[in-house]
Amino acid sequence: MDSNTVSSFQDILMRMSKMQLRSSSEGLNGMVTQFESLKIYRDSLGEAVMRMGDLHYLQNRNEKWREQLGQKFEEIRWLIEEVRHKLKITENSFEQITFMQALQLLLEVEQEMRTFSFQLI
């Protein structure tokens, strides 16, 4: 993962964790947690692709890795929808910018995860 992506993740996570939304900070904390989880999962997929020998390790370690991958795609789609919803309802420009950047990053991560997973299949 390049340094721009790392800093984008860190910046967005920091800003999202500091925001207090009228809806519920508990929901936002859940989004931040899922965002971090997806980042870690995407990183592990990328590392496995970099070392193609890890495909066999990945399959042996977790026979249901395709199922896990499907669950991660469901999580990222849910998170994308949540971010879109938050973007529609927020009136604060700082929050709008943060959510737009988060949405862009999530879409990039989803695309990278698809690319990595096709290389692993």
From Swiss-Prot:
Q: Where in the cell is it found?
A: Virion; Host nucleus
Which ranges belong to the motif Nuclear export signal?
Answer: 12-21, 85-94
> Can you list the GO cellular component terms from the UniProt entry?
host cell nucleus; virion component
Source species, domain of life: Viruses
Q: What's an example Gene Ontology biological process for this entry?
A: exit of virus from host cell nucleus through nuclear pore
Q: Which UniProt keywords apply?
A: Host nucleus, Host-virus interaction, Transport, Virion
Q: What is its main location?
A: virion
Any Pfam family = Flu_NS2
Protein biosynthesis: present as a keyword of the record?
A: no
What other facts are recorded? Average number present in a viral particle is estimated to be 130-200 molecules.
User: What is this protein's function per UniProt?
Assistant: Mediates the nuclear export of encapsidated genomic RNAs (ribonucleoproteins, RNPs). Acts as an adapter between viral RNPs complexes and the nuclear export machinery of the cell. Possesses no intrinsic RNA-binding activity, but includes a C-terminal M1-binding domain. This domain is believed to allow recognition of RNPs bound to the protein M1.
Family in the record: Belongs to the influenza viruses NEP family.
- What assembly does the database describe for this protein? Interacts with protein M1. May interact with host nucleoporin RAB/HRB and exportin XPO1/CRM1.
This chain's protein is named: Nuclear export protein
State the encoding gene.
NS
